């Protein structure tokens, strides 16, 4: 074996092999599951690079069987770069653009098997009866089935029989090894920096060692070895050939966050019998176990909302392993379903967070957790651990950072010791430090002169601060807030069970070209800070909790998953006697309001808004009717201050619109 091919997470956490345009050493990679190459490239440029992600794991790029299911990508037909993700030219373009953004590409690589059955692949190649463009029947093991009982006691069958009927390559064969190595070397020549070896447990570790001897350079390699204990093939066998997926991490973290006590986690990692940190790739969930297979257990997924946030915050804050963030799509209970038919970057619209792509890597608690890990990599130890013996914990990373999680229904109030310098810090889970370090877009945490923090963390919430998120309080911020009451009315005929939400702010392209705001990197730059005035409607009030911005991205962290943006309330100017007892906004949160002088079916957003974020007093918005018409179409409003396909409203005014109509009435209070 070639020792120079061993890459460890210790090296990764020190920044080896990982270029970055971010301000700190990248320490975390993300799996953009089933994203096409154009979307990956755009995400590298607009978000992953600026946010400090180290790399992207992409779906297998080689030719595969046809079909819409996600697992068709895991049935190879050839090693031609023609897949559902795109063609060779598009793949090369993605690698180059991501590299320029400081983000490496890791390829999911299928070394154990080829496709089952017969047919035609995505590049037009035919296959069948173990005959493929690059392999013949003699390149495969004899057909036999892996039984469930084999995993505990029959190494031979696990590594020589067929995984779910897939043609099992003879990976001890020199020809097979040379063919796979040629594919890997081709990808490296393009610029790929790492490889996930799928189903590595089904390939003898000695075969992988021989394969790696034929691979050029020193790519990052991490091997999928599902080992929950009691296996005929153990994960420890693969430590000499690269990094290894630590599935016990995902299972035990899920068990603890769901049913246990976070206080147990003070020695999480090797102290729990896991492999050495320097060898482990860790994750809260992955594309297999979030669907209930592939090492599944009591796994936490995006469907768990805030619990998922908190589990990822812990993973990213705790110094163990090389973490992988999962970026999923909503499969609506169909575990075979492929990705959404709409691209992530859809003609200027980001199809994230709702019922299509979930984009967990953009959730502020997860992106903030990555920022925390990047900026605490120089202190690879836990300091000042504190817990309440149950589900409130806090710990530090020396003088580099400190964090706390409250997974209880009551507020966490405690004074904890840190090793950090005194001052005010931005809670990077909830906001971002301004470029001049004079303000934070979210919560500010104070470290006292003695290094303590007086924690006051709400139920099911968290905080994380680091040395590079410290506010410069020597002078006041140059931009003063200008909070003014602002009301939006949008008329739309709706039915029972339908509700209207509004998204808005400043158009990203306009802000970048004319205002110098990079809103692709930071949505806060184009969002309008708001405070809801009407919290009396029992239906919409829960949707307004933790809705602090009128923005383009919908659900904010801590906001109800039922929300589709900023919730509005149904209003009218009169209440006929035939409707029963009169309902009013003042008493009930919906119904009659003196602000509505037009008629029924006017949905109202009543907020205080920071007008200092508007463009000469103007901002944009668009409505969405849940369980109804969906989004409005393009708007062409007369006398708009600049060209836009959205409604244009004035901050500090009453603005009246019609759904899917370009007209507007604006009046003062």
Swiss-Prot record:
EC number annotated for this UniProt entry: 3.2.1.1
Keywords, in A-Z order: Calcium, Carbohydrate metabolism, Chloride, Disulfide bond, Glycosidase, Hydrolase, Metal-binding, Secreted, Signal
Endpoints of the signal sequence: 1-24
A Pfam family assignment: Alpha-amylase_C
Residues annotated for substrate binding in this entry: 71-75, 113, 196, 201-202, 231, 288, 293
Highest taxon of source: Bacteria
Subcellular location(s) per record: Secreted
Enzyme class of the recorded protein, top EC level: hydrolase
Subunit structure: Monomer.
Record-stated family: Belongs to the glycosyl hydrolase 13 family.
Designated name of the protein: Alpha-amylase
Gene: amy
